[in-house]
Structures are given as C-alpha cells and as structure tokens.
Amino acid sequence: MGVAQHRQSKSRVRKRRAMWKLTAPNHIECPQCHKPKMPHHVCPSCGYYKAKEVISMGE
C-alpha cells in the first residue's frame, strides 16, 4: 500500500487534480429520424446505426 514519504503542498495536489473534470456527453443528430443520439451508438428512437436498421422498433 502506498504511503506518502513527504507532504505534498496544496498547489502540487491541485495541479495534479486539475485534469479531473467531467465532460458533458456529446450528442449528434440521427440522420434517419433527426433526434439526438450518442455518437457510435444505435439510435434509441428509430433503431438505425450507419444507415442500417439494427433494432426493429415495431411501430
């Protein structure tokens, strides 16, 4: 188990933690139904991925 040998200052700790930020999920418009969807995912509203129907939604 790692144990600190020397105390780290607040500025060093804060510099290290500076990259710990969350990014909001990016949404794109589905080319089939024009609703927002996550990139590289099947559209949850129409079931299309890369202009092919992957999941039949059964309207």
UniProtKB/Swiss-Prot annotation:
<dbReference type="GO" id="GO:0003735">
    <property type="term" value="F:structural constituent of ribosome"/>
</dbReference>
<comment type="similarity">
    <text>Belongs to the bacterial ribosomal protein bL32 family.</text>
</comment>
<protein>
    <recommendedName>
        <fullName>Large ribosomal subunit protein bL32</fullName>
    </recommendedName>
</protein>
<dbReference type="InterPro" id="IPR044957">
    <property type="entry name" value="Ribosomal_bL32_bact"/>
</dbReference>
<dbReference type="InterPro" id="IPR011332">
    <property type="entry name" value="Ribosomal_zn-bd"/>
</dbReference>
<dbReference type="GO" id="GO:0006412">
    <property type="term" value="P:translation"/>
</dbReference>
<dbReference type="GO" id="GO:0015934">
    <property type="term" value="C:large ribosomal subunit"/>
</dbReference>
<dbReference type="InterPro" id="IPR002677">
    <property type="entry name" value="Ribosomal_bL32"/>
</dbReference>
<keyword id="KW-0689">Ribosomal protein</keyword>
<keyword id="KW-0687">Ribonucleoprotein</keyword>
<dbReference type="Pfam" id="PF01783">
    <property type="entry name" value="Ribosomal_L32p"/>
</dbReference>
